[in-house]
Amino acid sequence: MSLEKMGQAAREAAYQLATVSTAQKNRALAAIADELEARSHQILAANEKDIAAGRAAGLSDAMLDRLLLNPARLAGIVADVRKVISLDDPVGAEIDSRVLENGLRLSRRRVPIGVIGVIYEARPNVTIDIASLCLKTGNASILRGGRETFHSNLELVRVIQSALAASGLPRDAVQYIDNPDRALVGELLRLDRYVDMIIPRGGAGLHKMCKENSSIPVIIGGFGISHIFVDESADLARSLAVIDNAKVQRPSACNALDSLLVHEKVAATLLPQLVGLMNERKVALVATPEAMPLLAGADSLRAAGPEDFDTEWLSLTLGVKLVADVNEALAHMREHNAGHSDAILTNDLANAERFVNGAGSAAVYVNASTRFTDGGQFGLGAEVAVSTQMLHARGPMGLTELTSYKWVGLADYLSRA
């Protein structure tokens, strides 16, 4: 099917979904969860093809891990779908209302956005996350996954479409571009006659390409250098535990710590302790000249180059820099692409407020790890993306962020004076 026809079919499906009840949508989601379990062997077999192709192509172990589905991960995906069922449906909710002097009762009511195009890389669970959130909010979706998970995604979408048809909902509510030709991405970005929003999920290059080539509004997010600033007043022992969590728990995540900024007055105490912990975790350190002597015992240490503090590591590598105060920390963050998740560790309330107000990040933390920026952790259920832009949505995008609103006026045959 051509993209033009996919767009037409998605638009028609979106019209139908806009009038579907919450109960109908939940039944479809339950059918998807049931069918994922029933067809687990086919899904895992398809994923094995992707893993074998990835190994043959020389993909790193970290990338192969992102591609991998196994029984435990598939069970987690099923659990996520069932959790979406339990979440409140925002569609139809009244945001606010008032009665005008002329008697018109005016309200704002949440509605689906329409058709959402999602371009993503690697993780096959994203296919189910996006489809389930879009369905719950009455949106149709056109998905374009990475070639690395081609077989997995095809099988997952077959499961979704089968469950939709069995539930009496249009199969075309979730469609997958099954041609790996990259030219089709550009074609999707220009399908503004049918597609209402584009969500890219991947690296900085993908986001840049979508932003520059799309005639459709694009949600920019997922990329950003994550910082922790250790202030002069911080509890250093407890700070080490937070730094360890932010860097090591899942280093390939977009909310993992990239750059550690340390107040110069506590650096001589903190950094030697950090070295032992990072050696144990096999973390490579990249440091500015003034920090190098304090990190001398590190197993892996090199001087920072011009690009290092602009690098989203997605691995066991950590940049380290000394700063004079919270203002210098904020200045560094502005210069080096902060925008996703950043934190201050401090016992000084004024500095905490200065950091929260001055950081331009989608999520800012005081005395907490950057790893909390996640739809599940925020109580939003699964997320479709983490937006780092100012307009429409910011931070983890859950159900509410996949809706718009319409004005509804109720009256008794009222005419304008």
UniProtKB/Swiss-Prot annotation:
It is found in: Cytoplasm. Pathway: Amino-acid biosynthesis; L-proline biosynthesis; L-glutamate 5-semialdehyde from L-glutamate: step 2/2. SUPFAM superfamilies: ALDH-like. One of its GO terms (biological process) is L-proline biosynthetic process. Its main location: cytoplasm. Keywords: Amino-acid biosynthesis, Cytoplasm, NADP, Oxidoreductase, Proline biosynthesis. PROSITE patterns: PROA (PS01223). It catalyses: L-glutamate 5-semialdehyde + phosphate + NADP(+) = L-glutamyl 5-phosphate + NADPH + H(+). It is an enzyme of class 1 (oxidoreductase). GO terms for molecular function: glutamate-5-semialdehyde dehydrogenase activity; NADP binding. GO terms for cellular component: cytoplasm. InterPro entries: Ald_DH/histidinol_DH, Ald_DH_C, Ald_DH_N, Aldehyde_DH_dom, G-glutamylP_reductase_CS, Glu-5-SA_DH, GPR_dom. Its EC number is 1.2.1.41. The keyword Secreted does not apply. Pfam families: Aldedh (PF00171). The keyword Nucleus does not apply. Belongs to the gamma-glutamyl phosphate reductase family. Catalyzes the NADPH-dependent reduction of L-glutamate 5-phosphate into L-glutamate 5-semialdehyde and phosphate. The product spontaneously undergoes cyclization to form 1-pyrroline-5-carboxylate. This is Gamma-glutamyl phosphate reductase. It comes from Aeromonas hydrophila subsp. hydrophila (strain ATCC 7966 / DSM 30187 / BCRC 13018 / CCUG 14551 / JCM 1027 / KCTC 2358 / NCIMB 9240 / NCTC 8049). The lineage of its organism: Bacteria, Pseudomonadati, Pseudomonadota, Gammaproteobacteria, Aeromonadales. The gene is proA.
